[in-house]
C-alpha cells in the first residue's frame, strides 16, 4: 500500500517528541482531604451525554459506557483442568530438547559437516527461524547464536545463496538471513535487497509462482516489515511482496502454504503475537523428516505444559479481581482475562509469571481508571481520588465514594507488591520511582476530565502532548519489565522508560492507533477530543476519512522509528527488556487491528483466548 504524503504533520514532528510529560498548567487546587468525609454533592460537574447517562444509587446522574459484562464464566476458569503437569511430559520435553540441540550441533564444522556446503547457510537459518516461530527458542539460545555467527561470517553485500559454496545468491536465503540477522542485532544493510531488482529497478518474479518462489517472496515480505527510517528499498519490497502474495492466494490451492501466507498478511510483525503464531505454525509445519517431527512434538508438548501454568495464573488473577470487588463495578469493562491472554502470548517463558500477571493487573487498572475518569466519575470525585493517590496513604480510602474504595486499595496494594517483586531482581526499592510515573498519568486524566466537563476541543498537538500520557502505556510497561530477571540500573532503565524516545514512540503510536478505532464510541459517550477530531479542527475542511488516512500514515512512519529504537546496534539496554516493552506495544496494536478490541471482546479476541489459553493443542 503506497505511503501517503503527510505534509501538514511535518511541522509538528519536533514538538511531537519534546517534553512528553511536561503538562500544561491546570487548576492545582486539591480538595481538603480532612473534610472529605462530609456528604458529597449530588451534582456532578461533568457534562452528561443524554444518550449515555444513567442514574446511580447515589442519585448522581452519570455517563456510562455501553460495555458488556465479563465474557468468561468464573466457574469455567475455576474448573480448568490439565494433565500436562505430569512428570512424563516434562521428561519428554527434556528429551526432545536434547535431540534438537544435537541437530543444531551436527551442523558445526567441528563435527564433520553432516550437511552440504551447498545448503548449510539456509539449513541454519531454517532451524533458527523454525524454533523461534514454534515458540521453543528459549531452549536454544547458544545454538542460535552459533548458527547466526556462522551465517554472518559468509554474509556478502550481494546476499547469500543456500550454502557457502553456492554459485548464485538466492532471494529466499537472503531475505530470511537479512531478517533473522537484523532481529538478532547483526549489522546488515537493507541495500542487499537491491540485488534482486531488474534493470528497471523493480522487484520481479517469474510469473510461474512455484512454491519456492512464493516462499522467497514471503520471506521478503517478512523482512520488509522491520524497516528503518529512510530505507526506500524496504518500502518497495513491502509493496511488491504484498501484491504478489495476495495474487498468489487467488491461484494456489488451500494448503499449509496458503494458511501461512494469510496469517502473515493479516498480522505482519507489529500486530503479531508469538504464541498465536506458534499455534498456527505447528498446524502447518512440515513433518517429512524425523527432525521436523521432533520440532513439532516439542512445540506441542511445551505449549501444553505452559497451558497448565496459564490455568493456575488465570485462576490467581480471577481471585485477585474478585477480592477487590471489580465484579461489582458494572460501569466498567471486565477484560482482565483478555489482558492475561495477551501477556501470555508474548511472555511465554514459565519464569515470567510476574510479568504476565503484572501486565494483566496494570492494564486492568488503566481500563478501569479510564472508565472512571472519562465517563463515570464526577469532577469532585476525580479530584479526591487523584489527591489520595498522590498521598499514597491507605487511610484516605474512607474519603472516597464506595465504588472508588476497592479500586484505590487494589492500586495501592498491587503496586506495592510488584515493587517488592521487582526488588528481588533489581536489588533496590523502585516504589518511589514507580509512584512518580503514576502522578503525571493522573494529572493527564484530570486535564481530559476538564476538557470533557467544559466541552473544550484542544489542538492536535495539545491533545497529543497530554493523551499519550493518559493512554497508560508507561504504566503497563514499567513494573512488569522490572520483574524480568535483568538488573536495570537507573540510567539504563531511562533508555526504555521516560524520557527515552523509545518510550515516547510507543506512547504516541498507541494513542494515535487507538483513537482511529475508538473515536466514534468515545464521542457517543460525550468525549469529543481525539486525535481524529483535533486533527480535523486544525485542518478545516478535512473529512474524517482523510484525517484517519493521514494519522495511519503517521503510524506507519513511526513504526519504522520504533524498529530502529528497538534494533539499533551498540545499545546498552538488554534486548530482552526492550523487546518486552516492544511486545506490549504489539499487544495493544493487535487489539486495534480491526476495531476497538478493548471496548468489548471481539470475535477475534475471544478466539485468541480459547486458542492460546483455554484449549490445549492436540498431541
Swiss-Prot record:
Domain of life (superkingdom)? Eukaryota
Q: What residue range does the UniProt record give for the transit peptide?
A: 1-47
Q: Name one GO biological process term.
A: diterpenoid biosynthetic process
Q: Where in the cell is it found?
A: Plastid, Chloroplast
Q: Which UniProt keywords apply?
A: Chloroplast, Lyase, Magnesium, Metal-binding, Plastid, Transit peptide
Q: Name one GO cellular component term.
A: chloroplast
The UniProt record gives the binding positions of Mg(2+) 1 as: 370, 374
The annotated pathway is: Terpene metabolism; oleoresin biosynthesis; Secondary metabolite biosynthesis; terpenoid biosynthesis
Q: Which cofactor does it need?
A: Mg(2+); Mn(2+)
Q: Which reaction does it catalyse?
A: (2E)-geranyl diphosphate = (1S,4R)-camphene + diphosphate; (2E)-geranyl diphosphate = (1R,5R)-alpha-pinene + diphosphate; (2E)-geranyl diphosphate = tricyclene + diphosphate; (2E)-geranyl diphosphate = beta-myrcene + diphosphate
Q: What is known of its domains?
A: The Asp-Asp-Xaa-Xaa-Asp/Glu (DDXXD/E) motif is important for the catalytic activity, presumably through binding to Mg(2+).
Name of protein: (-)-camphene synthase, chloroplastic
Q: Which organism is it from?
A: Pinus contorta (Shore pine)
Amino acid at each position: 500500500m503506497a505511503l501517503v504524503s503527510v505534509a501538514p504533520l511535518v511541522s509538528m514532528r519536533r514538538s511531537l517528541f519534546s517534553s512528553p510529560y511536561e503538562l500544561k498548567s491546570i487548576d492545582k487546587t486539591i480538595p481538603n482531604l480532612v473534610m472529605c468525609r462530609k456528604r458529597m454533592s449530588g451534582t456532578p460537574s461533568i457534562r452528561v451525554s443524554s444518550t449515555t447517562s444513567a442514574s446511580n444509587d447515589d442519585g448522581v446522574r452519570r455517563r456510562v459506557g455501553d460495555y458488556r459484562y465479563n465474557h468468561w464464566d468464573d466457574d469455567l476458569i475455576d474448573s480448568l483442568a490439565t494433565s500436562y503437569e505430569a512428570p512424563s511430559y516434562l521428561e519428554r520435553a527434556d528429551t526432545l530438547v536434547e535431540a534438537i540441540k544435537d541437530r543444531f550441533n551436527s551442523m558445526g564444522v567441528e563435527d564433520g559437516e553432516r550437511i552440504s556446503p551447498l545448503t548449510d547457510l539456509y539449513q541454519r537459518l531454517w532451524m533458527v527461524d523454525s524454533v523461534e516461530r514454534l515458540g521453543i527458542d528459549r531452549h536454544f539460545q547458544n545454538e542460535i547464536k552459533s548458527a547466526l555467527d556462522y551465517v554472518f561470517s559468509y554474509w556478502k553485500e550481494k546476499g547469500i545463496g543456500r550454502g557457502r559454496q553456492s554459485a548464485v545468491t538466492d532471494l529466499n536465503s537472503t531475505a530470511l538471513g537479512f531478517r533473522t540477522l537484523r532481529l538478532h542485532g547483526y549489522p546488515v544493510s537493507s541495500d542487499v535487497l537491491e540485488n534482486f531488482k531488474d534493470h528497471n529497478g523493480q522487484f520481479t518474479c517469474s510469473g510461474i509462482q512455484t512454491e519456492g518462489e512464493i516462499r522467497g517472496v514471503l520471506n521478503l515480505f517478512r523482512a520488509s516489515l522491520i524497516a528503518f527510517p529512510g530505507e526506500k528499498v524496504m518500502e518497495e519490497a513491502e509493496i511488491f511482496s504484498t501484491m504478489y502474495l495476495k495474487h498468489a492466494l487467488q491461484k494456489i490451492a488451500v494448503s499449509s502454504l496458503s494458511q501461512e501466507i494469510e496469517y502473515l498478511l493479516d498480522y505482519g510483525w507489529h500486530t503479531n503475537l508469538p504464541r498465536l503464531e506458534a499455534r498456527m505454525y505447528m498446524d502447518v509445519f512440515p513433518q517429512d523428516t524425523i527432525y521436523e517431527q521432533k520440532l513439532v512434538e516439542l512445540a506441542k508438548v511445551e505449549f501444553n505444559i505452559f497451558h497448565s501454568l496459564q490455568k493456575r495464573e488465570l485462576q490467581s488473577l480471577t481471585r485477585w479481581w474478585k477480592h477487590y470487588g471489580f465484579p461489582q463495578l458494572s460501569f466498567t469493562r471486565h477484560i482482565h482475562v483478555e489482558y492475561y491472554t495477551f501477556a501470555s502470548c508474548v511472555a511465554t517463558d514459565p519464569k515470567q509469571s510476574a510479568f504476565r500477571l503484572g501486565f494483566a493487573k496494570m492494564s486492568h487498572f488503566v481500563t478501569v481508571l479510564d472508565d472512571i475518569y472519562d465517563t463515570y466519575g464526577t469532577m469532585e470525585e476525580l479530584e479526591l481520588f487523584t489527591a489520595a493517590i498522590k498521598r499514597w496513604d491507605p487511610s484516605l480510602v474512607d474519603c472516597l465514594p464506595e465504588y472508588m474504595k476497592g479500586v484505590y486499595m487494589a492500586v495501592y496494594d498491587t503496586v506495592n507488591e510488584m515493587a517488592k517483586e521487582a526488588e528481588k531482581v533489581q536489588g533496590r526499592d523502585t516504589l518511589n520511582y514507580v509512584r512518580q510515573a503514576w502522578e503525571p498519568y493522573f494529572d493527564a486524566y484530570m486535564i481530559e476530565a476538564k476538557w470533557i466537563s467544559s466541552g473544550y476541543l484542544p489542538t492536535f498537538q495539545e491533545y497529543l502532548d497530554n493523551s499519550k500520557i493518559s493512554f497508560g502505556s508507561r504504566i503497563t510497561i514499567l513494573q512488569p519489565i522490572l520483574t524480568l530477571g535483568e538488573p536495570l540500573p537507573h540510567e539504563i532503565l531511562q533508555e526504555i522508560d521516560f524520557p527515552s524516545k523509545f518510550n515516547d514512540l510507543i506512547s504516541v503510536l498507541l494513542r494515535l492507533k487507538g483513537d482511529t478505532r475508538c473515536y466514534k464510541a468515545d464521542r457517543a459517550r460525550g468525549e469529543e477530543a481525539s486525535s481524529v477530531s483535533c486533527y480535523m479542527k486544525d485542518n478545516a475542511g478535512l473529512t474524517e476519512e482523510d484525517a484517519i488516512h493521514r494519522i495511519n500514515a503517521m503510524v506507519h512512519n513511526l513504526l519504522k522509528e520504533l524498529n530502529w529504537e528497538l534494533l539499533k546496534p551498540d545499545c546498552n539496554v538488554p534486548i530482552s527488556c526492550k523487546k518486552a516493552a516492544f511486545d506490549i506495544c504489539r499487544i495493544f496494536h493487535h487489539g486495534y487491528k480491526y476495531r476497538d478490541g478493548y471496548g468489548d471482546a471481539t470475535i477475534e479476541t475471544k478466539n485468541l483466548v480459547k486458542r492460546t489459553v483455554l484449549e490445549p493443542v492436540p498431541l
